[in-house]
Amino acid sequence: MKYDEFYKLCEKVYEPITNFEKSCLPLCAAENEQSEFTKIPLKSFIQDKYIMGGIEEYQEHNNFIGSNNLFELYNLLNRLSSELFKSMYADGRTLTGVNTISLLLMSLFKNNDKILISDEECGGHSSMPKLCKRLGIKTCSMPYDYNNYDFDYEKLNTLLLDDSIKGILICQSDMIFQPKLEKIKMDKNKILIYD
């Protein structure tokens, strides 16, 4: 395929995305409308846009609004990479958010490892238990003190004495206060991921 054809296809795919951008303000669930982070999508065209599933076949069910436009762009990138580099697969998604956590979990833990996570009931990101399950990582909820809107560090530190616990994933989506990481006591063989 000639590269000017790719350029025309890119323009065709790009137009619905920019139209979508003009009519929507995509907010991250963990941010309020005044934060600088939520203004990034207004300044950039593709940064921090999400699409669930792979990029070879679009999964419409429960996917993000506007992700069908993004899928077309990733599909075009995949085709161009195949043409230029003879690659079988190219993933142009940015290494941010859930993509980063996925990579960290796959790199730092093994199948059947057990970790503590901040679950949905205490403001944790709702996709983390599902992601861990898909990667074969067992999860337990971090103890939470609902009266103080914070983790129960005494109970947490007791749990961390268990050698079968390989680490902690604190991935908050909705939170009132920053967790006090300095109160977590863990040995050097355990891993803490904080997003």
Regions found by a protein language model. Give the residues of each.
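N-terminal "arm"/small-domain region of PLP-dependent enzymes with the aminotransferase-like
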Residues: 1-61
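Buried hydrophobic packing segments
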Residues: 38-41, 100-108
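Conserved N-terminal alpha-helix of the aminotransferase class I/II PLP-enzyme fold
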Residues: 46, 50-100, 107
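General beta-strand structural signal in soluble alpha/beta enzymes
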Residues: 89-94, 117-118, 169-170, 192-195
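Short glycine/serine/threonine-rich phosphate/pyrophosphate-binding segments
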Residues: 98-103, 123-128, 176-180
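Conserved PLP-anchoring active-site segment centered on the Schiff-base-forming lysine
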Residues: 109-124
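PLP-dependent aminotransferase-class I/II
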Residues: 131-178
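Catalytic PLP-binding core of fold-type I/II PLP enzymes
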Residues: 177-195
